[in-house]
A protein has these predicted regions:
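Low-complexity, polybasic segments enriched for Lys interleaved with small residues
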Residues: 2, 8-9, 13-31, 35-43, ...
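Catalytic cores of nucleotide-sugar-dependent glycosyltransferases that transfer UDP/GDP/TDP-activated
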Residues: 2-6, 11-12, 16-17, 81, ...
Length: 589
Protein backbone atom coordinates (compact mmCIF):
# COMPACT_ATOMS: atom_id res chain seq x y z
CA UNK A 1 0.00 0.00 0.00
CA UNK A 2 1.41 3.38 -0.88
CA UNK A 3 1.60 6.24 1.54
CA UNK A 4 -1.04 8.11 -0.43
CA UNK A 5 -3.47 5.23 -0.31
CA UNK A 6 -2.86 4.69 3.36
CA UNK A 7 -3.54 8.32 4.14
CA UNK A 8 -6.83 8.34 2.29
CA UNK A 9 -8.18 5.21 3.91
CA UNK A 10 -10.92 5.84 6.42
CA UNK A 11 -11.52 2.40 7.78
CA UNK A 12 -9.34 -0.37 9.08
CA UNK A 13 -9.42 -3.19 6.54
CA UNK A 14 -10.87 -6.52 7.62
CA UNK A 15 -7.94 -8.51 9.04
CA UNK A 16 -6.66 -11.35 6.88
CA UNK A 17 -7.29 -14.82 8.34
CA UNK A 18 -4.87 -15.98 8.09
CA UNK A 19 18.95 -37.11 15.33
CA UNK A 20 15.83 -37.55 17.72
CA UNK A 21 16.81 -38.36 21.30
CA UNK A 22 16.97 -41.95 22.45
CA UNK A 23 13.48 -42.98 23.51
CA UNK A 24 12.75 -43.81 27.11
CA UNK A 25 12.51 -47.47 27.62
CA UNK A 26 8.98 -48.06 28.72
CA UNK A 27 6.91 -44.96 28.77
CA UNK A 28 3.23 -45.20 29.56
CA UNK A 29 0.66 -46.23 27.05
CA UNK A 30 -2.32 -43.95 26.57
CA UNK A 31 -5.22 -45.05 28.75
CA UNK A 32 -8.35 -45.61 26.72
CA UNK A 33 -11.41 -43.83 27.96
CA UNK A 34 -13.80 -46.77 27.61
CA UNK A 35 -11.47 -49.15 29.35
CA UNK A 36 -11.39 -49.41 33.10
CA UNK A 37 -7.86 -50.62 33.66
CA UNK A 38 -7.02 -52.04 37.01
CA UNK A 39 -3.78 -50.10 36.98
CA UNK A 40 -4.15 -46.56 35.74
CA UNK A 41 -0.46 -45.86 36.01
CA UNK A 42 1.77 -45.96 32.96
CA UNK A 43 3.86 -49.04 32.31
CA UNK A 44 7.02 -48.64 34.34
CA UNK A 45 10.14 -47.75 32.45
CA UNK A 46 13.42 -49.35 33.33
CA UNK A 47 13.58 -48.57 37.02
CA UNK A 48 16.28 -46.41 38.43
CA UNK A 49 17.92 -47.54 41.69
CA UNK A 50 15.76 -47.03 44.73
CA UNK A 51 16.36 -44.00 46.89
CA UNK A 52 19.30 -44.45 49.18
CA UNK A 53 17.33 -43.46 52.23
CA UNK A 54 13.72 -42.91 52.96
CA UNK A 55 12.77 -39.37 53.90
CA UNK A 56 10.53 -38.75 56.82
CA UNK A 57 7.02 -37.62 56.10
CA UNK A 58 6.98 -33.83 55.98
CA UNK A 59 5.45 -31.81 58.73
CA UNK A 60 1.97 -30.50 58.24
CA UNK A 61 1.51 -26.80 57.69
CA UNK A 62 0.02 -26.30 61.15
CA UNK A 63 -3.51 -26.84 59.90
CA UNK A 64 -6.60 -26.15 61.90
CA UNK A 65 -8.48 -29.43 62.24
CA UNK A 66 -11.75 -29.58 60.36
CA UNK A 67 -14.35 -31.83 61.90
CA UNK A 68 -14.95 -34.57 59.45
CA UNK A 69 -14.23 -38.25 59.32
CA UNK A 70 -11.57 -39.55 56.97
CA UNK A 71 -12.90 -40.17 53.50
CA UNK A 72 -11.86 -42.79 51.01
CA UNK A 73 -10.54 -41.88 47.59
CA UNK A 74 -13.84 -42.81 46.00
CA UNK A 75 -15.84 -40.72 48.44
CA UNK A 76 -13.75 -37.66 47.92
CA UNK A 77 -14.27 -37.88 44.18
CA UNK A 78 -17.90 -36.99 44.83
CA UNK A 79 -17.41 -35.26 48.19
CA UNK A 80 -20.08 -34.75 50.76
CA UNK A 81 -20.85 -31.40 52.26
CA UNK A 82 -19.84 -30.80 55.83
CA UNK A 83 -23.39 -29.67 56.44
CA UNK A 84 -26.38 -29.58 54.12
CA UNK A 85 -26.45 -26.44 52.02
CA UNK A 86 -29.81 -25.04 51.06
CA UNK A 87 -29.64 -24.55 47.30
CA UNK A 88 -32.47 -22.03 47.40
CA UNK A 89 -30.52 -19.92 49.84
CA UNK A 90 -27.58 -19.54 47.49
CA UNK A 91 -27.64 -16.05 45.99
CA UNK A 92 -27.95 -15.70 42.26
CA UNK A 93 -24.70 -15.28 40.41
CA UNK A 94 -23.96 -12.16 38.44
CA UNK A 95 -25.68 -12.38 35.07
CA UNK A 96 -23.22 -12.99 32.26
CA UNK A 97 -22.63 -10.14 29.87
CA UNK A 98 -24.03 -10.63 26.37
CA UNK A 99 -21.51 -12.50 24.26
CA UNK A 100 -21.70 -13.10 20.54
CA UNK A 101 -21.79 -16.89 20.26
CA UNK A 102 -21.32 -18.81 17.02
CA UNK A 103 -24.22 -21.19 17.64
CA UNK A 104 -23.49 -23.24 14.52
CA UNK A 105 -20.28 -24.48 16.15
CA UNK A 106 -20.46 -27.90 17.90
CA UNK A 107 -20.78 -27.28 21.64
CA UNK A 108 -18.20 -28.55 24.11
CA UNK A 109 -17.74 -27.93 27.82
CA UNK A 110 -14.24 -27.10 29.06
CA UNK A 111 -12.83 -26.60 32.55
CA UNK A 112 -9.65 -24.50 32.62
CA UNK A 113 -7.54 -25.23 35.71
CA UNK A 114 -4.56 -23.01 36.46
CA UNK A 115 -2.79 -21.00 39.12
CA UNK A 116 -3.42 -17.45 37.83
CA UNK A 117 -5.71 -15.43 35.62
CA UNK A 118 -5.96 -11.74 34.78
CA UNK A 119 -7.47 -9.56 36.30
CA UNK A 120 -7.62 -11.51 39.57
CA UNK A 121 -3.94 -12.42 39.84
CA UNK A 122 -1.25 -12.26 37.17
CA UNK A 123 2.52 -12.67 37.31
CA UNK A 124 3.23 -13.57 33.67
CA UNK A 125 1.88 -14.73 30.34
CA UNK A 126 -0.10 -17.61 31.87
CA UNK A 127 -2.46 -15.08 33.44
CA UNK A 128 -3.14 -13.49 30.05
CA UNK A 129 -3.88 -16.85 28.41
CA UNK A 130 -6.21 -17.98 31.22
CA UNK A 131 -8.18 -14.77 30.71
CA UNK A 132 -8.26 -14.31 26.94
CA UNK A 133 -8.55 -17.87 25.60
CA UNK A 134 -11.70 -18.85 27.57
CA UNK A 135 -13.45 -15.65 26.47
CA UNK A 136 -12.72 -16.41 22.82
CA UNK A 137 -13.83 -20.04 23.25
CA UNK A 138 -17.20 -18.83 24.55
CA UNK A 139 -17.68 -17.17 21.15
CA UNK A 140 -16.98 -20.55 19.54
CA UNK A 141 -19.89 -22.10 21.46
CA UNK A 142 -17.91 -23.60 24.33
CA UNK A 143 -19.28 -23.75 27.86
CA UNK A 144 -16.24 -22.64 29.86
CA UNK A 145 -15.40 -22.57 33.55
CA UNK A 146 -12.08 -21.36 34.91
CA UNK A 147 -11.02 -22.85 38.24
CA UNK A 148 -8.52 -20.87 40.30
CA UNK A 149 -7.24 -20.66 43.87
CA UNK A 150 -8.91 -17.95 45.92
CA UNK A 151 -5.74 -16.15 46.91
CA UNK A 152 -5.94 -13.50 49.60
CA UNK A 153 -4.17 -11.10 47.20
CA UNK A 154 -7.10 -11.03 44.75
CA UNK A 155 -8.33 -7.40 44.72
CA UNK A 156 -11.28 -6.62 46.97
CA UNK A 157 -13.36 -5.37 44.03
CA UNK A 158 -13.48 -8.96 42.72
CA UNK A 159 -13.67 -10.65 46.12
CA UNK A 160 -16.80 -8.62 46.88
CA UNK A 161 -18.52 -9.81 43.69
CA UNK A 162 -17.93 -13.50 44.33
CA UNK A 163 -20.98 -15.61 45.15
CA UNK A 164 -20.89 -18.53 47.58
CA UNK A 165 -21.62 -21.80 45.78
CA UNK A 166 -21.06 -24.39 48.48
CA UNK A 167 -18.48 -26.21 50.55
CA UNK A 168 -17.36 -29.72 51.40
CA UNK A 169 -14.49 -31.54 53.05
CA UNK A 170 -11.91 -33.60 51.23
CA UNK A 171 -9.21 -35.94 52.50
CA UNK A 172 -5.76 -35.17 51.22
CA UNK A 173 -3.02 -37.71 50.71
CA UNK A 174 -1.59 -39.32 53.80
CA UNK A 175 -2.20 -36.36 56.06
CA UNK A 176 -4.97 -38.15 57.95
CA UNK A 177 -7.06 -35.00 57.76
CA UNK A 178 -10.06 -33.71 55.91
CA UNK A 179 -9.64 -30.24 54.45
CA UNK A 180 -12.24 -27.57 53.88
CA UNK A 181 -12.99 -26.76 50.23
CA UNK A 182 -15.16 -23.72 49.57
CA UNK A 183 -16.40 -22.65 46.14
CA UNK A 184 -16.87 -18.97 45.31
CA UNK A 185 -18.16 -17.97 41.88
CA UNK A 186 -17.85 -14.94 39.63
CA UNK A 187 -19.22 -14.60 36.08
CA UNK A 188 -17.79 -12.20 33.52
CA UNK A 189 -18.12 -12.05 29.70
CA UNK A 190 -19.88 -15.41 29.60
CA UNK A 191 -17.09 -17.20 31.50
CA UNK A 192 -17.74 -18.73 34.92
CA UNK A 193 -14.83 -18.37 37.36
CA UNK A 194 -14.90 -20.79 40.30
CA UNK A 195 -12.45 -20.02 43.10
CA UNK A 196 -11.30 -22.80 45.42
CA UNK A 197 -11.28 -21.40 48.93
CA UNK A 198 -9.04 -22.61 51.76
CA UNK A 199 -7.28 -20.01 53.84
CA UNK A 200 -4.74 -22.49 55.16
CA UNK A 201 -3.24 -22.78 51.68
CA UNK A 202 -4.16 -19.49 50.00
CA UNK A 203 -3.85 -16.83 52.70
CA UNK A 204 -0.38 -15.60 51.71
CA UNK A 205 0.01 -12.54 49.50
CA UNK A 206 2.02 -13.91 46.58
CA UNK A 207 0.69 -16.99 44.75
CA UNK A 208 4.22 -18.38 44.39
CA UNK A 209 6.40 -18.47 47.49
CA UNK A 210 8.82 -21.42 47.46
CA UNK A 211 8.52 -25.12 46.73
CA UNK A 212 8.21 -26.02 50.42
CA UNK A 213 4.90 -24.12 50.51
CA UNK A 214 3.89 -24.43 46.86
CA UNK A 215 4.02 -28.23 46.57
CA UNK A 216 1.32 -28.85 49.24
CA UNK A 217 -0.68 -25.87 47.95
CA UNK A 218 -0.95 -27.11 44.38
CA UNK A 219 -1.40 -30.77 45.35
CA UNK A 220 -4.44 -29.61 47.32
CA UNK A 221 -5.64 -27.30 44.55
CA UNK A 222 -5.40 -29.91 41.77
CA UNK A 223 -7.40 -32.45 43.74
CA UNK A 224 -9.90 -29.91 45.06
CA UNK A 225 -10.58 -28.59 41.54
CA UNK A 226 -11.69 -32.03 40.35
CA UNK A 227 -13.65 -32.71 43.52
CA UNK A 228 -15.40 -29.34 43.07
CA UNK A 229 -16.52 -30.29 39.56
CA UNK A 230 -18.10 -33.45 40.98
CA UNK A 231 -19.66 -31.48 43.83
CA UNK A 232 -21.23 -28.96 41.43
CA UNK A 233 -22.31 -31.81 39.14
CA UNK A 234 -20.75 -29.94 36.22
CA UNK A 235 -18.83 -32.57 34.28
CA UNK A 236 -16.82 -31.09 31.41
CA UNK A 237 -15.94 -32.82 28.16
CA UNK A 238 -12.39 -31.46 28.49
CA UNK A 239 -10.24 -30.57 31.48
CA UNK A 240 -7.59 -28.13 30.20
CA UNK A 241 -4.83 -27.59 32.76
CA UNK A 242 -1.82 -25.32 32.65
CA UNK A 243 1.81 -25.66 33.77
CA UNK A 244 3.18 -27.64 36.70
CA UNK A 245 0.84 -26.12 39.27
CA UNK A 246 -2.09 -28.01 37.67
CA UNK A 247 -0.11 -30.88 36.12
CA UNK A 248 -1.32 -33.43 38.68
CA UNK A 249 -4.88 -33.03 37.39
CA UNK A 250 -4.47 -35.60 34.56
CA UNK A 251 -2.79 -37.98 37.05
CA UNK A 252 -5.66 -37.66 39.54
CA UNK A 253 -8.20 -38.07 36.72
CA UNK A 254 -6.84 -41.49 35.75
CA UNK A 255 -6.24 -42.76 39.29
CA UNK A 256 -8.20 -41.51 42.29
CA UNK A 257 -10.99 -39.93 40.21
CA UNK A 258 -11.19 -42.53 37.46
CA UNK A 259 -14.48 -44.07 38.61
CA UNK A 260 -16.10 -40.74 39.53
CA UNK A 261 -18.21 -38.62 37.14
CA UNK A 262 -15.36 -36.24 36.26
CA UNK A 263 -13.17 -39.23 35.40
CA UNK A 264 -14.95 -39.37 32.03
CA UNK A 265 -13.37 -36.08 30.93
CA UNK A 266 -10.45 -35.93 28.52
CA UNK A 267 -7.40 -33.94 29.64
CA UNK A 268 -5.07 -31.46 27.97
CA UNK A 269 -1.92 -30.10 29.60
CA UNK A 270 -0.44 -26.88 28.21
CA UNK A 271 3.23 -26.06 28.80
CA UNK A 272 3.80 -22.31 29.00
CA UNK A 273 7.39 -22.53 30.23
CA UNK A 274 9.17 -25.87 30.58
CA UNK A 275 11.79 -24.45 32.93
CA UNK A 276 9.36 -24.71 35.88
CA UNK A 277 8.36 -28.30 36.64
CA UNK A 278 7.38 -28.76 40.31
CA UNK A 279 10.16 -31.14 41.37
CA UNK A 280 10.38 -32.35 44.97
CA UNK A 281 11.26 -35.53 46.84
CA UNK A 282 8.95 -38.50 46.35
CA UNK A 283 7.91 -38.98 50.01
CA UNK A 284 6.63 -35.40 50.22
CA UNK A 285 4.54 -35.66 47.07
CA UNK A 286 3.23 -39.09 48.12
CA UNK A 287 2.30 -37.59 51.48
CA UNK A 288 0.31 -34.71 49.99
CA UNK A 289 -1.34 -36.59 47.12
CA UNK A 290 -2.01 -40.14 48.28
CA UNK A 291 -1.32 -41.30 44.73
CA UNK A 292 -0.51 -45.02 44.36
CA UNK A 293 3.08 -46.21 44.20
CA UNK A 294 2.48 -47.30 40.59
CA UNK A 295 2.62 -43.67 39.39
CA UNK A 296 6.04 -43.02 40.92
CA UNK A 297 7.93 -44.74 38.09
CA UNK A 298 10.35 -43.40 35.50
CA UNK A 299 7.66 -43.24 32.84
CA UNK A 300 5.51 -40.95 34.98
CA UNK A 301 6.30 -38.90 38.09
CA UNK A 302 9.67 -40.30 39.09
CA UNK A 303 12.77 -38.34 38.14
CA UNK A 304 16.25 -39.45 39.07
CA UNK A 305 16.60 -41.56 42.20
CA UNK A 306 14.60 -39.71 44.83
CA UNK A 307 12.50 -37.02 43.16
CA UNK A 308 9.04 -36.70 41.71
CA UNK A 309 8.33 -34.27 38.88
CA UNK A 310 4.73 -33.05 38.79
CA UNK A 311 4.93 -31.70 35.23
CA UNK A 312 6.49 -34.93 33.97
CA UNK A 313 3.66 -36.96 35.50
CA UNK A 314 1.04 -34.73 33.91
CA UNK A 315 2.68 -35.08 30.50
CA UNK A 316 2.53 -38.87 30.80
CA UNK A 317 -1.14 -39.01 31.80
CA UNK A 318 -2.64 -36.19 29.70
CA UNK A 319 -4.57 -37.19 26.58
CA UNK A 320 -2.99 -34.30 24.68
CA UNK A 321 -0.08 -31.94 25.34
CA UNK A 322 0.11 -28.46 23.88
CA UNK A 323 2.64 -25.70 24.08
CA UNK A 324 2.50 -22.13 22.92
CA UNK A 325 4.19 -22.32 19.50
CA UNK A 326 5.06 -24.93 16.91
CA UNK A 327 8.78 -24.20 17.01
CA UNK A 328 8.89 -24.46 20.81
CA UNK A 329 7.09 -27.82 20.57
CA UNK A 330 10.01 -29.05 18.46
CA UNK A 331 12.71 -27.30 20.52
CA UNK A 332 11.68 -28.89 23.83
CA UNK A 333 12.37 -32.34 22.36
CA UNK A 334 16.08 -31.42 22.16
CA UNK A 335 18.71 -31.33 24.89
CA UNK A 336 19.29 -27.61 24.45
CA UNK A 337 15.71 -26.66 25.31
CA UNK A 338 14.25 -29.79 26.94
CA UNK A 339 15.18 -28.92 30.54
CA UNK A 340 15.84 -32.61 31.26
CA UNK A 341 12.51 -33.79 29.79
CA UNK A 342 13.55 -33.98 26.13
CA UNK A 343 13.42 -37.81 25.98
CA UNK A 344 10.09 -37.88 27.82
CA UNK A 345 8.62 -35.31 25.43
CA UNK A 346 10.03 -37.06 22.37
CA UNK A 347 8.39 -40.29 23.54
CA UNK A 348 5.03 -38.47 23.84
CA UNK A 349 5.49 -36.38 20.69
CA UNK A 350 2.53 -38.06 18.98
CA UNK A 351 0.20 -36.23 21.36
CA UNK A 352 2.17 -32.94 21.41
CA UNK A 353 1.38 -29.90 19.28
CA UNK A 354 2.13 -26.18 19.33
CA UNK A 355 -0.52 -23.46 19.10
CA UNK A 356 0.68 -19.85 19.05
CA UNK A 357 -0.91 -17.49 21.56
CA UNK A 358 -2.76 -14.38 20.47
CA UNK A 359 -3.27 -10.96 22.03
CA UNK A 360 -6.45 -9.45 23.38
CA UNK A 361 -7.55 -6.68 21.02
CA UNK A 362 -9.72 -5.28 23.78
CA UNK A 363 -6.59 -4.47 25.79
CA UNK A 364 -4.05 -3.92 23.01
CA UNK A 365 -5.54 -1.78 20.26
CA UNK A 366 -4.05 1.52 19.04
CA UNK A 367 -7.46 2.59 17.73
CA UNK A 368 -8.99 2.68 21.23
CA UNK A 369 -6.01 2.66 23.63
CA UNK A 370 -6.65 5.37 26.28
CA UNK A 371 -2.93 5.56 27.13
CA UNK A 372 -1.98 7.13 23.78
CA UNK A 373 -1.88 10.84 22.96
CA UNK A 374 -3.34 10.05 19.54
CA UNK A 375 -5.15 6.90 18.52
CA UNK A 376 -4.53 5.47 15.09
CA UNK A 377 -5.40 2.56 12.82
CA UNK A 378 -4.01 0.86 9.74
CA UNK A 379 -5.57 3.56 7.61
CA UNK A 380 -3.91 6.55 9.31
CA UNK A 381 -0.86 5.11 11.09
CA UNK A 382 1.55 7.10 8.92
CA UNK A 383 -0.07 10.35 10.07
CA UNK A 384 -0.63 9.68 13.77
CA UNK A 385 2.07 7.33 15.04
CA UNK A 386 4.63 10.15 14.91
CA UNK A 387 2.67 12.15 17.51
CA UNK A 388 3.07 9.24 19.93
CA UNK A 389 6.80 9.09 19.22
CA UNK A 390 7.28 12.78 20.06
CA UNK A 391 5.12 12.42 23.19
CA UNK A 392 7.19 9.43 24.35
CA UNK A 393 10.43 11.34 23.85
CA UNK A 394 9.06 14.24 25.89
CA UNK A 395 7.75 11.95 28.66
CA UNK A 396 11.12 10.24 29.08
CA UNK A 397 13.33 13.31 28.74
CA UNK A 398 14.76 12.28 25.39
CA UNK A 399 15.68 14.71 22.64
CA UNK A 400 12.43 15.44 20.79
CA UNK A 401 13.30 14.65 17.20
CA UNK A 402 11.02 12.72 14.87
CA UNK A 403 14.04 11.80 12.75
CA UNK A 404 15.61 9.67 15.50
CA UNK A 405 15.28 5.89 15.31
CA UNK A 406 13.64 4.83 18.60
CA UNK A 407 14.18 1.26 19.82
CA UNK A 408 12.02 -0.03 22.68
CA UNK A 409 12.54 -3.01 24.98
CA UNK A 410 9.77 -4.16 27.34
CA UNK A 411 10.86 -7.19 29.32
CA UNK A 412 11.92 -8.83 32.52
CA UNK A 413 15.59 -7.93 32.83
CA UNK A 414 17.05 -11.44 32.89
CA UNK A 415 19.50 -13.56 30.91
CA UNK A 416 16.64 -15.59 29.43
CA UNK A 417 15.41 -12.43 27.70
CA UNK A 418 18.78 -11.78 26.05
CA UNK A 419 19.71 -8.77 28.15
CA UNK A 420 23.38 -9.78 28.19
CA UNK A 421 23.41 -9.34 24.40
CA UNK A 422 21.64 -5.99 24.64
CA UNK A 423 24.10 -4.72 27.27
CA UNK A 424 27.02 -5.70 25.04
CA UNK A 425 25.85 -3.86 21.91
CA UNK A 426 24.52 -0.58 23.36
CA UNK A 427 27.77 1.39 22.79
CA UNK A 428 27.71 0.44 19.09
CA UNK A 429 23.98 1.16 18.76
CA UNK A 430 24.20 4.69 20.21
CA UNK A 431 25.43 6.48 17.08
CA UNK A 432 23.74 9.86 17.54
CA UNK A 433 20.77 8.92 15.36
CA UNK A 434 19.33 6.25 17.66
CA UNK A 435 17.46 6.36 20.95
CA UNK A 436 16.79 3.39 23.26
CA UNK A 437 14.00 2.98 25.82
CA UNK A 438 14.12 0.16 28.39
CA UNK A 439 11.11 -0.76 30.57
CA UNK A 440 11.22 -3.56 33.13
CA UNK A 441 12.71 -4.94 36.32
CA UNK A 442 14.82 -7.98 37.06
CA UNK A 443 18.43 -8.85 37.81
CA UNK A 444 20.32 -6.12 39.64
CA UNK A 445 23.23 -6.48 37.20
CA UNK A 446 21.09 -5.39 34.25
CA UNK A 447 19.21 -2.71 36.16
CA UNK A 448 22.51 -1.07 37.14
CA UNK A 449 23.96 -1.42 33.63
CA UNK A 450 20.99 0.31 32.01
CA UNK A 451 21.01 3.08 34.64
CA UNK A 452 24.67 3.63 33.77
CA UNK A 453 23.84 3.89 30.06
CA UNK A 454 21.09 6.39 30.84
CA UNK A 455 23.68 8.63 32.45
CA UNK A 456 26.25 8.04 29.73
CA UNK A 457 23.84 8.84 26.87
CA UNK A 458 21.74 11.63 28.33
CA UNK A 459 18.77 12.55 26.19
CA UNK A 460 19.22 9.44 24.03
CA UNK A 461 18.78 6.51 26.45
CA UNK A 462 15.96 6.03 28.99
CA UNK A 463 16.05 3.29 31.64
CA UNK A 464 12.63 2.87 33.27
CA UNK A 465 13.43 0.29 35.96
CA UNK A 466 9.82 -0.48 36.81
CA UNK A 467 6.83 -2.07 35.18
CA UNK A 468 4.22 0.48 34.20
CA UNK A 469 1.43 -0.98 32.06
CA UNK A 470 0.32 2.40 30.73
CA UNK A 471 3.88 3.35 29.77
CA UNK A 472 4.29 -0.01 28.03
CA UNK A 473 1.37 0.92 25.77
CA UNK A 474 3.01 4.25 24.97
CA UNK A 475 6.33 2.58 24.13
CA UNK A 476 4.59 0.20 21.74
CA UNK A 477 2.98 3.19 20.04
CA UNK A 478 5.95 5.57 20.12
CA UNK A 479 8.90 3.32 19.26
CA UNK A 480 9.94 2.50 15.71
CA UNK A 481 11.24 -0.98 16.59
CA UNK A 482 11.05 -3.38 19.53
CA UNK A 483 13.88 -5.67 20.69
CA UNK A 484 13.09 -9.27 21.71
CA UNK A 485 16.48 -11.06 21.60
CA UNK A 486 15.52 -13.97 23.89
CA UNK A 487 17.75 -16.94 24.63
CA UNK A 488 14.54 -19.00 24.43
CA UNK A 489 10.93 -17.86 24.12
CA UNK A 490 8.03 -20.35 24.26
CA UNK A 491 5.71 -17.88 22.52
CA UNK A 492 6.29 -14.24 23.33
CA UNK A 493 3.57 -11.61 23.36
CA UNK A 494 5.59 -8.40 23.13
CA UNK A 495 6.41 -8.93 19.46
CA UNK A 496 2.68 -9.45 18.74
CA UNK A 497 1.76 -6.27 20.61
CA UNK A 498 4.47 -4.38 18.73
CA UNK A 499 3.24 -5.54 15.33
CA UNK A 500 -0.33 -4.58 16.14
CA UNK A 501 0.90 -1.07 17.05
CA UNK A 502 2.97 -0.74 13.86
CA UNK A 503 6.32 -1.16 15.62
CA UNK A 504 8.67 -3.54 13.85
CA UNK A 505 10.10 -6.43 15.89
CA UNK A 506 13.82 -7.28 16.03
CA UNK A 507 13.93 -10.83 17.39
CA UNK A 508 16.01 -13.96 17.75
CA UNK A 509 14.75 -16.95 15.76
CA UNK A 510 13.56 -19.14 18.63
CA UNK A 511 10.21 -20.49 19.78
CA UNK A 512 7.20 -18.33 19.07
CA UNK A 513 9.41 -15.49 17.84
CA UNK A 514 10.45 -17.61 14.88
CA UNK A 515 6.82 -18.60 14.21
CA UNK A 516 5.46 -15.04 14.22
CA UNK A 517 8.23 -12.87 12.72
CA UNK A 518 9.30 -13.38 9.11
CA UNK A 519 12.68 -11.78 8.35
CA UNK A 520 12.59 -8.80 6.01
CA UNK A 521 14.05 -9.59 2.59
CA UNK A 522 15.89 -6.67 0.97
CA UNK A 523 15.40 -8.09 -2.52
CA UNK A 524 11.71 -9.05 -2.47
CA UNK A 525 10.46 -6.68 0.23
CA UNK A 526 8.75 -9.60 2.00
CA UNK A 527 8.79 -10.08 5.75
CA UNK A 528 7.53 -8.26 8.81
CA UNK A 529 10.58 -7.80 11.04
CA UNK A 530 14.30 -8.39 11.51
CA UNK A 531 15.78 -11.60 12.89
CA UNK A 532 19.03 -13.33 13.83
CA UNK A 533 19.62 -17.00 14.59
CA UNK A 534 22.60 -17.85 16.80
CA UNK A 535 22.74 -16.35 20.28
CA UNK A 536 25.57 -13.88 19.63
CA UNK A 537 25.81 -10.15 20.30
CA UNK A 538 27.34 -9.50 16.88
CA UNK A 539 24.32 -11.02 15.15
CA UNK A 540 21.95 -8.94 17.28
CA UNK A 541 23.87 -5.81 16.30
CA UNK A 542 23.66 -6.83 12.64
CA UNK A 543 19.86 -7.22 12.89
CA UNK A 544 19.55 -3.78 14.51
CA UNK A 545 21.72 -2.24 11.80
CA UNK A 546 19.61 -3.83 9.06
CA UNK A 547 16.51 -2.28 10.62
CA UNK A 548 18.20 1.13 10.86
CA UNK A 549 19.40 0.94 7.26
CA UNK A 550 15.88 0.32 5.97
CA UNK A 551 14.46 3.07 8.20
CA UNK A 552 16.96 5.74 7.12
CA UNK A 553 17.44 4.81 3.45
CA UNK A 554 14.07 3.47 2.29
CA UNK A 555 11.24 4.91 4.36
CA UNK A 556 8.72 3.92 1.70
CA UNK A 557 9.46 0.22 2.22
CA UNK A 558 9.66 0.72 6.00
CA UNK A 559 6.15 2.17 5.99
CA UNK A 560 4.91 -0.77 3.92
CA UNK A 561 6.21 -3.19 6.54
CA UNK A 562 4.55 -1.12 9.29
CA UNK A 563 1.22 -1.42 7.48
CA UNK A 564 1.79 -5.13 6.81
CA UNK A 565 2.34 -5.76 10.51
CA UNK A 566 -0.77 -3.85 11.53
CA UNK A 567 -2.79 -5.81 8.98
CA UNK A 568 -1.62 -9.16 10.38
CA UNK A 569 -4.21 -10.98 12.50
CA UNK A 570 -2.54 -11.68 15.85
CA UNK A 571 -5.78 -11.93 17.84
CA UNK A 572 -6.90 -14.91 19.91
CA UNK A 573 -9.45 -15.91 17.27
CA UNK A 574 -7.11 -18.14 15.25
CA UNK A 575 -5.61 -19.72 18.36
CA UNK A 576 -9.03 -20.43 19.86
CA UNK A 577 -10.16 -22.13 16.65
CA UNK A 578 -7.18 -24.48 16.84
CA UNK A 579 -7.96 -25.33 20.46
CA UNK A 580 -11.61 -25.93 19.56
CA UNK A 581 -10.51 -28.32 16.80
CA UNK A 582 -8.37 -30.16 19.37
CA UNK A 583 -11.34 -30.44 21.75
CA UNK A 584 -13.51 -31.86 18.97
CA UNK A 585 -10.77 -34.30 17.99
CA UNK A 586 -10.65 -35.63 21.56
CA UNK A 587 -14.42 -35.87 21.99
CA UNK A 588 -15.78 -37.32 18.78
CA UNK A 589 -19.28 -38.75 19.09
Amino acid sequence: MTRKKADSANKKPTPKKATPPVAEKAAPATVKKEAAPKKAAPVEEKAAPAAAKKEAAPKKAAPVEEKASPATAKKEATPKKAAPVEEKAVPAAEAPAPVEVMAHQPRRSVAFIGSECYPFVKTGGLGDVMYALPRELVRLNCDVRVILPRYACIPKEYQDKMVYRGEFYMDLGRTGRNYYVGIMEYIHDGVVYDFIDNQEFFSTGNPYINLVDDIPKYCFFSKAALAALNYMNWIPDIVHCHDWQAALVPVFLKTLFQSSPVGKAKSILTIHNLRFQGIYNIPTIQYWTGLPDSVFVMGALKQGYEDANMLKGGLAYADRITTVSGTYAQEIQTKEYGEGLENHLWYHSQKLRGIVNGIDYGMWNPETDPSLVENYSLGNVLDHKMANKLALQKELGLEEDEGKFVIGLISRLTNQKGLDLVSAVIPQVMDGNTQVVILGTGDREFEDTFRYYEGAYKGQFAACIQYDESRAHRIYAGADALLVPSRFEPCGLTQLNAMHYGTLPIVRETGGLKDTVEPYNDFTGDGNGFTFDRYESGLLLDAINRAKTLYFTNRYHWDEVVQRDMDKDVSWENSAKQYKELYLELTQW
